[in-house]
């Protein structure tokens, strides 16, 4: 076994097993819930925001589905859609980074792993970024960082509240230091947004890990999370081996983080839009008046 193979095997077990075990059947009329085993009619699952009606398990959804659930119908206006990543390091492990990018772009129809734009929630304007785990595990490279930074800067300039839906394995190793510097770049933009006394809310979904957790995911005025989402920096196995202690079964879950003060509230997906609207109202946001009124 080569050094790379050894490292890859170790990395596979770095995070809680649920992430890899929750793969769902993507074709057909029925979906089996990985939490309770219930077989659900796909249309019924989608009608319930992809939440299992039997156990409440939140199935993973893509960025398009997320936008439909949050934004007023027809209100989302995408920004920087044509920004596309390059391969500045000529990186290659088992496969070339350029090949991985092309594969992810073909399978998702996206240029990179985040969609950014402006929208309304019950008539109230808001800037929103939605990370998509389908694209290379939602990893944060230079384009993801640039798009989020541009969105934060636009929100600051226009006096808008900001929501970032996080779903990521962390910084994209194929871009090396260029990916790591996005942590500081986004954090700096968020600090200027905070200085303008504007609301920022990250929504932590399953999973939110690595460099994303270590930067903008934890810098919100109000930190929201979906039920049972995996949230952490290093993986469970790494922490246990470092501390030489057994960690609690619910360690790195949204519920554990809320109990220890790292998450403000856990919001079921079916209640998210209503909750966001209430929080926007609470922070003084007002609905736009219809034209001619």
Curated annotation (Swiss-Prot):
Record-listed Zn(2+) binding positions: 33, 36, 52, 55
Which InterPro entries does the UniProt entry name for this protein? AcCoA_carboxyl_beta, Acetyl_CoA_COase_Trfase_b_su, ClpP/crotonase-like_dom_sf, COA_CT_N, Znf-ACC
Query: What reaction is this protein's catalytic activity?
Result: N(6)-carboxybiotinyl-L-lysyl-[protein] + acetyl-CoA = N(6)-biotinyl-L-lysyl-[protein] + malonyl-CoA
GO CC annotation terms, alphabetical? acetyl-CoA carboxylase complex
* SUPFAM superfamilies linked: ClpP/crotonase
Disulphide bridges, residue numbers: none
The protein's UniProt keywords, in alphabetical order, are: ATP-binding, Cytoplasm, Fatty acid biosynthesis, Fatty acid metabolism, Lipid biosynthesis, Lipid metabolism, Metal-binding, Nucleotide-binding, Transferase, Zinc, Zinc-finger
Q: Which residues form the CoA carboxyltransferase N-terminal domain?
A: 29-293
Known cofactor(s)? Zn(2+)
Q: Name one GO biological process term.
A: fatty acid biosynthetic process
Q: What is its EC number?
A: 2.1.3.15
Pathway listed for it? Lipid metabolism; malonyl-CoA biosynthesis; malonyl-CoA from acetyl-CoA: step 1/1
The stretches annotated as zinc fingers (C4-type) lie at 33-55
Q: Name one GO molecular function term.
A: zinc ion binding
User: How is the cofactor bound, in the record's words?
Assistant: Binds 1 zinc ion per subunit.
HAMAP family, A to Z: AcetylCoA_CT_beta
Family (UniProt): Belongs to the AccD/PCCB family.
Q: How does it assemble?
A: Acetyl-CoA carboxylase is a heterohexamer composed of biotin carboxyl carrier protein (AccB), biotin carboxylase (AccC) and two subunits each of ACCase subunit alpha (AccA) and ACCase subunit beta (AccD).
Q: What does this protein do?
A: Component of the acetyl coenzyme A carboxylase (ACC) complex. Biotin carboxylase (BC) catalyzes the carboxylation of biotin on its carrier protein (BCCP) and then the CO(2) group is transferred by the transcarboxylase to acetyl-CoA to form malonyl-CoA.
Question: Can you say what this protein is called?
Answer: Acetyl-coenzyme A carboxylase carboxyl transferase subunit beta
Q: What species is this protein from?
A: Prochlorococcus marinus (strain MIT 9313)
């Amino acid at each position: 076994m080569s050094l790379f193979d050894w490292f890859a095997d170790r990395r596979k077990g770095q995070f809680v097993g649920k992430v890899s075990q929750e793969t769902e059947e993507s074709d057909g009329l029925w979906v089996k819930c990985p939490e309770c085993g219930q077989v659900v009619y796909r249309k019924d699952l989608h009608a319930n925001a992809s939440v299992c009606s039997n156990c409440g398990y939140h199935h993973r959804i893509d960025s398009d589905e997320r936008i439909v659930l949050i934004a007023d119908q027809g209100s989302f206006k995408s920004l920087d859609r044509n920004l596309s990543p390059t391969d500045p390091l000529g990186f290659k492990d088992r496969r070339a980074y350029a090949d991985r990018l092309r594969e992810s772009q073909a399978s998702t129809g996206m240029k990179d792993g985040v969609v950014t734009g402006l929208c309304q929630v019950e008539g109230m304007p808001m800037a929103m970024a939605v990370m998509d785990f389908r694209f290379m595990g939602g990893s944060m490279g230079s384009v993801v960082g640039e798009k989020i930074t541009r969105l934060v800067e636009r929100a600051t300039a226009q006096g808008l509240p900001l929501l970032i839906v996080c779903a990521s394995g962390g910084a994209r190793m194929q871009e090396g230091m260029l990916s790591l510097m996005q942590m500081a770049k986004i954090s700096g933009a968020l600090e200027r947004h905070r200085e303008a006394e504007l609301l920022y809310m990250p929504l932590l979904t399953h999973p939110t890990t690595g460099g994303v957790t270590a930067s903008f995911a934890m810098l919100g005025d109000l930190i929201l999370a979906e039920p049972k989402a995996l949230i952490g920096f290093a993986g469970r196995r790494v922490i246990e081996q470092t501390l030489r202690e057994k960690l609690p079964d619910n360690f790195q879950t949204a519920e554990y983080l809320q109990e220890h003060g790292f998450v403000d509230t856990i919001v079921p997906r079916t209640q998210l839009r209503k909750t966001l609207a209430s929080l926007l109202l609470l922070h003084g946001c007002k609905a736009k008046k219809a034209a001619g009124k």
